[in-house]
Curated annotation (Swiss-Prot):
Its EC number is 4.1.1.37. It comes from Synechocystis sp. (strain ATCC 27184 / PCC 6803 / Kazusa). GO terms for cellular component: cytoplasm. Pathway: Porphyrin-containing compound metabolism; protoporphyrin-IX biosynthesis; coproporphyrinogen-III from 5-aminolevulinate: step 4/4. InterPro entries: UROD/MetE-like_sf, Uroporphyrinogen_deCO2ase_HemE, Uroporphyrinogen_deCOase. Keywords: Cytoplasm, Decarboxylase, Lyase, Porphyrin biosynthesis. Substrate binds at residues 28-32, 47, 78, 155, 210, 325. It is found in: Cytoplasm. NCBIfam families: hemE. One of its GO terms (molecular function) is uroporphyrinogen decarboxylase activity. It comes from the Bacteria. Belongs to the uroporphyrinogen decarboxylase family. This is Uroporphyrinogen decarboxylase. CDD domains: URO-D.
Amino acid sequence: MTEANDLPYLLRVARGEVVKRPPVWMMRQAGRYMKVYRDLRDKYPSFRERSENPDLAIEISLQPWQAFQPDGVIMFSDILTPLPGIGIPFDIIESKGPIIDPPIRTQAQVDQLHALDPESSLPFIKTILGTLRKEVGNQSTVLGFVGAPWTLAAYAIEGKSSKDYKVIKQMAFSEPAILHSFLDKIAEAIAVYVRYQIDCGAQVVQLFDSWAGQLSPQDYDTFALPYQQKVVKLVKEIHPDTPLILYISGSAGILERMGKSGVDIVSVDWTVDMADARQRLGKEMKVQGNMDPGVLFGSQDFIKERILDTVRKAGQGGHIFNLGHGVLVGTPEDNVRFFFETAKQVDQLL
């Protein structure tokens, strides 16, 4: 039996232990702001190759670990990665983002989708997560991640990134039965995928429902929340002790609803004051976040001030320090280094 204090720091906090400082990692900590990543991208221009070739995905996942020693190392992947495994092919064009052609628009297309068998369709995930666990040992927590049903449905139905989500909203409000049957199938597949990631070594898994912030609260309750809850329920039946995090961009209007999803930790974006978030979610709910990633373009004194402000507002215990969104392209690497160094000494600075 592993002693609690032998477990990695972030995992201990995610499970409810109170420690001297909040653990720290960054969404998108492996990526284009790092020169080593850009050099690798120039050599391997296909995003899918970088995220699905185990050697490359492992190397990229470990780049921020080697540079900054964050308390969390997240698998380098994409939220769309499991879709071909249920019958939805996609491609990622470097300047345009994901393309799904043909997009899902009819009940007949939904009916043709099949269950996810990750062992056969996503075998590289086992290699990536297993190797990351070996590489970081108990020095850091290995995180898996998935897209939540509404957001994956938005990509699959729109066929690409969208500014107004007109196509999926048209389906939601004129043919809701098609959308509900699609969301249900995605929820089952994502639950299988999360369980597989945990089986392969993920110690914490983050669900990204990036586009659920585009929904009104009543539509969130209809089209996003029930399917988040289904994923969480199916995962917790098999892995009750694995902490789950939910992140939504632009979530100020639905924050309390996120707390009803069943996850252990709500990742708060920077548009919500952290003290308000803690009050709105209740003291039992753990939180993650939520410094504005734009702060990392400021002076080091300013960055330090904002780190301390966020940690102070989050209060004692139940907080994983992070940005309120992914780190931005062009962020100075020295400022990222300073962010991690400062966050790791925060108990001495407050």
